[in-house]
From Swiss-Prot:
It catalyses: ATP + H2O + cellular proteinSide 1 = ADP + phosphate + cellular proteinSide 2. GO terms for molecular function: ATP binding; metal ion binding; protein-exporting ATPase activity. Its EC number is 7.4.2.8. Its cofactor is Zn(2+). It comes from Granulibacter bethesdensis (strain ATCC BAA-1260 / CGDNIH1). This is Protein translocase subunit SecA. It is an enzyme of class 7 (translocase).
Length: 917
């Protein structure tokens, strides 16, 4: 109550911020007459003047009024559209690095031109991020006309572009693209071998369109670049056949829909073991024995695929592929795959080709990618419900920008039915009634399957309807553009079509493009255009009189924001409209989050078949349930971020070190330091500090140095000499190693040696980082169990991840030292050949013969990864293990599980000859 009183006197913080922006709007408006009097050439010259002001020390805030006024005047001349005052406010919110909440139809795309132009004047590049390639292309092509008029260049980054196109796009003043493409380009750049091959510039400023979708809904979805791992497709198919039978017995497993988890019961474990033994998949022991851990993992993923993932809801099957459906947008996510074998389990379930498993080479979440921008802003129609999350995770404030005209949409109370069948019949009956008034209808559903149920009901009533879901992805823009035509019925999965306005009466531009595509320019085409525009204008007036667009929601989403997005499709720019949600006790939200009380209440009311209850109390109860779910999801995203931050800190260190190597002309000093550290560690292992000379293991040291440096160093002889202490031994060994490498360098030639050291360092860093990512993934999967031992899983993860990171750095030094010592150099590469131009070096190795090295690229110009180093280099890893014979696998039984396999595959022993089961 006190808070309401304070707001009534002083206004909310949102109101106070808006008043500050309003004063600057007056400054911008005051410049309009002066700029309107300029010729096009004079207006365009203002861009050069503003750039000069910045060069002379002016700030962006200082030139903001003039820059915004110039953009508004240019927009009037290029598009015939003048920015409203509220759009100027939206532009200032974005320039200040905040999130502007602007209702659907308020012209967010045009608003973005204001801060984009202003910040692009610095020449450092501005990124405009959209949710799909279609919107990126559309906005870049349309708004690019305005930027071009003002003397700025525009680039676009979309899927399938060549490197040269991408580099040119990023070096433009303004770059449009999707969140996926920006993120993947960052990862790809950090796998390059020359700075000049990188496509992105340093990050400066980004505006994220539909910011809630990208930074909230997709926050937990990492971008992953992966390479092929071992092929286990047969095991997936075999396990799928077993689990397919198992799930027919409900007593075999327990499912928790709130947590989206499933596990075997005791009876289920016994049953699946019997089936696995009978099918020959299990040959010894029980399912939970250590050596059967791989089979257990496959069973768990197959069980998830059969019980938690539904076809046409979470995914569709097309062209022999399982394609993920984005739960928030309903769009296909072609190219995205579930990790940890889940996607392969779904492929086996659907009897399509089981693709090879992949190993992560590089990954990043959108949370950590976008937090790298020094200045970040966003715009959306719905952000206030997630304001706390934006503030806590991204340090972004949310400001609600008022609409240009008052919202006239009528939002009806929810109607709740007992069953889904009754609900869908009520929806179909309402649509039939609405169409008679000439009102267009947009029906929102949560899955492809449910959208097709409604379509079938409408077909029975002979009501034509357009279906907009992942299966009609290609026609999305056309369907949405015409969704406002009189009597048109459009059924959309979630927010498919987001980013395209639904205009009452239809879209004249879309009709002209489709109906007159083949008609040549001339009087006939002009007449046809005039006719279409007249028809659309008449239809617009008819639909307005009929009540505008009627939005029907067929289910409440877990997030209020998604429901608000659906409602927001109606009532754009002061248009009339209506919205209403139809629910049933069988809906996911009602069923999972407390429909028992509501169901009991409906029974007490004596609700009959086909009847609904409509009461504001229902809306409040649902909103309360949604808030609980939103809070839970926020906590989950925060928790994921805490773990990802550990990897993110390590990733930043590795990428910074990698860039330092790329930038260096000569890394010989780094390589020498690595060699010195590795040799020091080896000496310490065999000659402990303050040990007597007779306690030295000089034979072991000699063997270790032979394996590491591919040379016999007479340490045993030195150890017998009078007066040789530990320090003298270290000095002699280091001097001998340096001399060996100096001889190699002289033989190879100075230039060739610099190439080789740099290539080796970068490739080996990539290799150990890839292996480290796999270890972190495995650590993350099981770390939650530490809670049972009264230990904090996050602290345990941080501690062990740090230890693994240090071990990775040690492995890097070991491999670089060993490989450089093992190689023999042929002729140096030709002076004109640069090994980093289009691919990386290929190291061909063997054991125990000396190694030859050559620079090469693959047949298609692809990078050829570094093959694993020879087994000899790992001898030091087995220094404390007796009886190891590298040529006899039967002697490897005591090899440490995490040590490199003695066979030389480059994999850890536990993933190779030490594989369990």
């Amino acid at each position: 109550m006190f808070a309401r009183l304070v707001r009534s006197i002083f206004g909310s913080s949102n109101d106070r911020s808006l008043r500050g922006y309003q004063r600057r709007v007056q400054q911008i408006n005051a410049l309009e007459p002066e700029l309107a009097a300029l010729t096009d050439a004079e207006l365009q010259a203002r861009t050069i003047l503003l750039k000069q002001k910045l060069a002379d020390g002016a700030t962006l805030d200082g030139i903001l009024p003039e820059a915004f006024a110039i953009v508004r005047e240019a927009s009037k001349r290029v598009f015939g559209m003048r920015h409203f005052d509220v759009q100027l406010i939206g532009g200032m919110v974005l320039h200040d690095g905040k999130i502007a909440e602007m209702r659907t139809g308020e012209g967010k795309t045009l608003v973005a031109t204001l801060p984009v132009y202003l910040n692009a004047l610095t020449g450092k590049g501005v990124h405009v991020v959209t949710v799909n390639d279609y919107l990126a292309r559309r906005d870049a092509e349309t708004m690019g006309q305005l930027y071009s008029f003002l003397g700025l260049s525009t680039g676009i980054v979309v899927h399938g572009q060549e490197e040269l196109e991408r580099r040119a796009a990023y070096h433009a003043d303004i770059t449009y693209g999707t969140n996926n493409e920006f993120g993947f380009d960052y990862l790809r750049d950090n796998m390059k071998y020359r700075l000049e091959d990188m496509v992105q510039r340093d990050f400066t400023y980004a505006i994220v369109d539909e910011v809630d979708s990208i930074l909230i809904d997709e926050a937990r979805t990492p971008l992953i670049i992966s390479g092929p791992a071992e092929d286990s497709s047969n095991l997936y198919r075999s396990v799928d056949a077993v689990v397919r039978e198992l799930v027919k017995d409900p007593a075999a497993f327990e499912k928790d829909e709130k947590q989206r988890s499933v596990h075997l019961t005791e009876a289920g474990s016994e049953k699946v073991e019997e089936m696995l033994h009978a099918s020959g998949i299990l040959t010894d022991g029980n399912l939970y024995d250590t050596f059967n851990i791989t089979v257990l993992h496959h069973v768990q993923q197959s069980l998830r695929a059969h019980t938690l993932f539904e076809r046409n809801v979470e995914y569709i099957v097309r062209d022999d592929k399982v394609i993920i459906i984005d739960e928030f947008t309903g769009r296909m996510m072609d190219g995205r795959r579930y990790s940890e074998g889940l996607h392969q389990a779904l492929e086996a379930k659907e009897h399509v080709t089981v693709q090879q498993e992949n190993q992560t080479l590089a990954s990043i979440t959108f949370q950590n990618y976008f937090r790298m921008y020094p200045k970040l802003a966003g715009m959306t129609g719905t952000a206030l419900t997630e304001a706390d999350e934006f503030a806590e995770i991204y340090k972004l404030d949310v400001l609600a920008v008022p609409t240009n005209l008052p919202v006239q949409r009528k939002d009806g109370d929810d109607e709740v039915y007992r069953t889904a069948r009754e609900k869908y019949e009520a929806v179909a009956n309402l649509i039939e009634e609405i169409r008679t008034r000439g009102q267009p209808v947009l029906v929102g559903t949560t899955s492809i399957e449910k959208s097709e149920v409604i379509k079938q009901l409408l077909d029975q009533k002979r009501i034509p309807a357009e279906l907009l879901n992942a299966k009609q992805h290609e026609r999305e823009a056309i369907i949405v553009a015409e969704a406002g035509a009189p009597g048109r019925v459009t059924i959309a999965t979630n927010m498919a079509g987001r980013g395209t306005d639904i205009k009452l009466g239809g879209n004249a531009e879309a009709r002209i493009q489709t109906e007159l595509a083949d008609m040549p320019e001339g009087p006939e085409r002009d007449a046809a255009i005039a006719r279409i525009e007249q028809e659309v204008q008449e239809a617009h007036e008819a639909v307005r009189k009929a009540g505008g667009l009627f939005v029907i929601g067929t289910e409440r989403h877990e997030s209020r924001r998604i429901d608000n997005q659906l409602r927001g499709r109606s009532g754009r720019q002061g248009d009339p409209g209506e919205s209403r949600f139809f629910l049933s006790l069988e809906d996911d939200l009602m069923r999972i989050f407390g429909s028992d009380r509501m169901g009991a209440m409906l029974q007490r009311l004596g609700l009959k078949d086909g009847e609904a209850i409509i009461h504001p109390w229902i809306n409040k109860a649902l909103e309360k349930a949604q808030k609980k779910v939103e809070a839970r999801n926020f906590d989950m995203r925060k928790n994921v971020l805490k773990y990802d931050d550990v990897m993110n800190d390590q990733r930043k260190e590795v990428y910074a070190q990698r860039r330092e190597f790329m930038n260096a002309d000569d890394v010989s000093e780094t390589v020498a330091d690595m060699r010195e550290e590795v040799i020091d560690t080896l000496i310490t292992r065999h000659i402990p500090e303050r040990a007597f000379q007779e306690q030295w293991d000089t034979a072991g040291l000699a063997a270790g140095l032979r394996a590491l440096l591919n040379a016999d160093i007479p340490v045993e002889q030195w150890g017998r000499e009078e007066g040789v202490d530990e320090a003298e031994m270290r000095r002699r060994v280091q001097a001998a190693a340096t001399e060996l490498m100096d001889v190699k360098a002289a033989h190879a030639g100075a230039d060739a040696m610099r190439y080789i050291e740099k290539a080796l360092l970068l490739q080996t860093l990539d290799q150990v980082w890839k292996e480290h990512l796999l270890l972190l993934d495995q650590l993350r999967q099981g770390i939650g169990l530490r809670a049972y031992g009264q230990r904090d899983p996050l602290n345990e993860y941080k501690s062990e991840a740090f230890s693994l990171f240090n071990a990775m750095l040690d492995e890097l030094k070991q491999r670089v030292t060993a490989i450089l010592a093992q190689v023999e150099f042929g002729a140096p590469p030709p002076a004109s050949a640069d090994p980093f131009v289009s691919g990386s070096s290929q190291f061909v190795e063997s054991h125990p013969e000396p190694v030859s090295i050559r620079m090469a690229v693959g047949p298609n110009g692809e990078d050829i990864p570094l093959p694993p180093p020879p087994p000899a280099m790992f001898s030091a890893a087995y220094a404390d293990v007796e009886g190891i014979d590298f040529n006899d696998p039967s002697t490897w039984i005591n090899v440490p599980r995490n040590a490199p396999c003695p066979c030389g595959s480059g994999q850890k022993y536990k993933h190779c000859h030490g594989r369990l089961g």
